Amino acid sequence: MDISTKFDGLVLENPLMPAAGPVVGDAEKMLWLEQVAGCGAIVAKTVSTKDAHIPHPCIYGDRDYIMNCELWTEYPKEKWINEFFPYFKKHSVGKPLIVSVGYTKEDMEVLIPALDKFADAFEVSTHYVGNDLNALGETVATIRKLTKKPFFMKISAHMPDPEGFAHTIKVNGANGVVAVNSLGPSMKIDIASREIIYGNTKGFAWTSGPYIKNIALATVYTIKKAEPSLTVIGVGGIASASDVIEFLLAGASGVQMLSAAMLRGKELYAKIIADLPATLEKYGFKSVEEVINTNLKHETVFGMAEPPSVDANKCSKCGTCARICPYFAIEMDGVPKFNSEKCFRCGLCVSKCPVKALTYHKADK
């Protein structure tokens, strides 16, 4: 099974990369992700012209999300230039290194020339710059003048105009988009202490992890549809091999993961890579490239002929469908019984059935 992927001159033996963050916060961590976890490429923690002043604690983990106020690297750029990147390049097995930098045009004028010799490509965070597309365009044009390396602009989940973002970076010379950065601002309150327990000086943090996967998928799809020539790297919510495939189907050429590994263990990188061949085979794919080249189907249906049908052999009689039905249309009589007049054909019960015993009935065309 061929799980390799190629884009913008980069060749990855598998499509999974770490996202910029604490797990790639120095050379030893990056080498672990490359050689132990087996990632297809390495993305370094974001470097800026100033080292970040980070509050503590700065990371909060819940079941399906991470909240962080960690900002970018806590180390000065000189430590990356003189120590981390040289050490990584010396001991690397040669997988692509994507150097993450942020944030403004003025930052780029300092960082790109200083880091160009280490980078196989750049990822550029716009997280704290705002939504000004004119300023974005100027930043992209500046980067293009400063390097011949491919570079990808990272879009935040709260960007109101992803199509405009994509068009702006394309016409100014970027190779692609990394979609998406964390979502926010967000907040965590401890009721017992009447306290905001994580956050910056305003009490705010940023949310990532499986919780934001559907937002990330929609952004990847939107950008690839709007600007097909741009490379898209998907990030936000990946936690399994099937998640990887979903992002590739949505339009990504590669993917990044961070939060799920922080919630479930760093061994998750190797597990996803190991699981990918069998998961591809399960869904009838022969390679990652085939997934990327698959046209995603979509059909909007207005109305369904009948309520969902029940497979009595699968039904566990758990009653979940009846308890959650917002239209009070299901009663349990051993198996679910639908009131056709009350049933709105909304689909909630089908999506929530734990044993997949319910099936839609689409209206005749």
Where are these regions (language model features)?
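C-terminal helical cap(s) of enzyme catalytic domains, especially alpha/beta-barrels
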Residues: 53-67, 187-204, 248-249, 260-285
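Alpha-helix-loop-beta-strand connector modules within alpha/beta enzyme cores
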Residues: 67-93, 136-155, 199-232, 272-285
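Glycine/Thr-rich beta-alpha phosphate-binding loop at enzyme active sites
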Residues: 66-68, 124-135, 165-230, 264
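Glycine-rich phosphate-binding active-site loops on the catalytic face of alpha/beta enzymes
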Residues: 44-50, 123-129, 176-186, 237-238, ...
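Glycine-rich, positively charged N-terminal anion/phosphate-binding segment
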Residues: 2-6, 27-91, 136
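Iron-sulfur cluster-binding cysteine motifs and their immediate structural context
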Residues: 320-337, 348-364
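Active-site beta->alpha loop and helix N-cap motifs at the rims of alpha/beta catalytic domains
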Residues: 63-133
